[in-house]
Amino acid sequence: MKSVIGRKIGMTSVFTEDGTTYPVTVVEVLPNVVLQKKTVEKDGYEALQVGYEDKKESRANKCELGIAKKANTTPKYFVKELEGDEIYSNHEVGSTIDCSIFEAGDAIDVVAKSKGHGYTGVIKRYHAHIGPKGHGSGYHRQIGSLATNGRCNNRVHAGKKMGGQWRPQTTTIHNLVVVDVNPNNNCLLIRGSVPGPKYSVMKIRSAIKSLKKKIPVSKLVNYKTETVEQIEKIQEEALEAKAKEEALKAEEKESKAN
């Protein structure tokens, strides 16, 4: 099993050569630095503890500084554990894991925190029935009777479904597909949506259910895979061409005036 930590950037659409449109989520996967290696002898299980996104040393405590020093890296904002025999055997403390471990067509699972909804009523939170909508009814989107039958039931039982905070929850979406891998820009394109708001951190791992085979994905036709340097060069060439065009127009105006 392969796994890596990434950050959700947003959603867009890409097209393939046969005209198919894919709604995709762009996930930034910066290099995951291995901070610790959990062993069966010492910890009782095997896993890699990785860090994502650098943190200033002034914002880290002594424990974080010590772990980062052993791995010869800087402290990290997000520290998570990754499981899997493949990444465990191929990486040591101080090494990095990036998006190149995946390929286009790989089936993956995404583990992330869903969006919170704040304070919500019982209709939205638990899908309770809506009351009568006539003008004479006493309620519309409120909960009905709280009473129960039986002895000593003149109270509201613990766990009664009512309105309240609908907080974020850790959610797993199974069997998504990697549409494209771009190691130059440290990003993955994942078909469909993933849980959580923009810029939230998530774990991407190989699919654990029956869909483990690689899915054929057609070649993309409108997706730019240039590096940052190549993009800057293209922009400079465009600016130079525009400047030449403006200079020619100015010369034509001067010649007409003369």
Model-derived regions: residue spans:
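Extended basic (Lys/Arg/His-rich) segments that typically form rRNA-contacting surfaces
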Residues: 1-258
